[in-house]
Every structure is written in structure tokens, then in C-alpha cells.
């Protein structure tokens, strides 16, 4: 996990990707990878979540370019710090 997670609403382009994604959540797992926790979940931009199978999961290390950084205030900063602590605890358990 990268030390500085991006705020919700950030728009990114992934390595080997041609479609922009907007970040909509953090610390998610999938049925396909139940033992892996991804840094982010998101959906295609500008389409949004069209169907549940259009949700993407990815890690910060997969981001090639940050196109737009989402809104960040003190509340979000505290939340991101908490998420980083949770991810460290999860990694220590595995």
C-alpha cells in the first residue's frame, strides 16, 4: 500500500489501461481473490457504475497517472490514516 492513498473521487489511469477510473472505495476484496485486500475499488469514468460487474478493484501500485485528485478535507485525511492502520494490521495477520 502506498503511504498516501488518494481521496474518493480521484480519477486515475491504470498501467496498461486505456479507460479512466474514479475511486469509490477502499480496502475491498472480491470472491475471486478472497484472501487479498485491494487498496481501492472504482468504476469507469465518466460512465459510473452501470452494473455490479463493472466495479474494478486495484492497488495504488497499478496507477500509472493521476488525472484528478478528489476532495480532501480533515475528515477524509483522518479516515485515510485509519485505513492505512487497518491495512497494516491486515498485512501483519497474513
Regions found by a protein language model. Name each.
Residues 19, 39-41:
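A generic structural signal for short beta-strands and their flanking turns/coil linkers
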Residues 3-6:
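Short, well-ordered loop/turn sites that connect or cap secondary structure elements
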Residues 29-38:
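Short, solvent-exposed secondary-structure boundary/capping segments
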Amino acid at each position: 500500500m502506498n503511504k498516501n492513498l488518494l481521496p474518493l473521487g480521484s480519477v486515475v489511469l491504470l498501467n496498461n489501461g486505456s479507460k479512466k477510473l474514479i475511486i469509490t472505495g477502499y480496502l475491498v476484496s472480491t470472491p475471486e481473490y478472497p484472501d487479498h485486500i485491494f487498496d481501492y475499488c472504482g468504476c469507469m469514468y465518466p460512465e459510473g457504475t452501470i452494473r455490479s460487474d463493472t466495479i474494478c478493484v486495484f492497488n495504488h501500485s497499478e496507477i500509472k497517472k493521476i488525472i484528478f485528485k478528489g476532495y480532501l478535507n480533515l475528515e477524509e485525511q483522518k479516515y485515510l490514516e485509519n485505513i492505512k492502520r487497518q491495512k497494516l494490521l491486515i498485512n501483519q495477520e497474513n
